[in-house]
Amino acid sequence: MSLTAGILAVQGDVSEHAAAIERAGQTHDTAVNILEIRESGQIPSCDVLLLPGGESTAISRLVHREGIADEIYTHARANKPLLATCAGLILLSRDSGDDKLETLDLLDVTVERNAFGRQRDSFEAPISVTGLDEPFPAVFIRAPAIVEVGDDVDVLAEWNGRIVAVRQDAIVATAFHPELLEDSRIHDLAFF
């Protein structure tokens, strides 16, 4: 079996996410073709889509200006798997807490940006994630927290009483960076 995985490649850990998706694919005997999304017209050929971290305001401006936002929306509305991490979570949210940031309103959540502090406050913590047998070593870098969820959103993980991972339909979103370690279970949970 094969799978085409699109990764929004305007910012973030593209190669690390690609490696994680490929590792997850290997555990399912699935060949993964990685497509780095940089312009409109690429997402329709993707089976799954990943929106990595970065600076959410810059990413929002780029995807809207380049016509990529409409394709992300169409992908999600077709109930195709989508994993959004950190800034990707903010981009998909209903409310980012910033009126200047245009979100896609695909995920019925409200987020608080930089909820765990600035860059120097980055940390790793083992968290229990629904669907995983063992705690996941989550890396938080300028991470948002989810402060409100809609009725159709399943909370997958919390850390210190704050929501850090959710699922709504075929969308999995995390406040942390699952790509920074050799553990590909979050990518597996989202795509396989």
Could you tell me what each predicted segment is?
Residues 3, 30-32, 80, 102, ...:
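A structural micro-motif
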Residues 1-65, 70-77, 184-188, 192:
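N-terminal beta1-alpha1 cap of cysteine-dependent amidohydrolase-like domains
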Residues 10, 85-87, 107, 142, ...:
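A secondary-structure boundary/capping signal
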Residues 50-51, 84, 174:
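Redox-cofactor binding/interface segments in oxidoreductases and associated redox assembly factors
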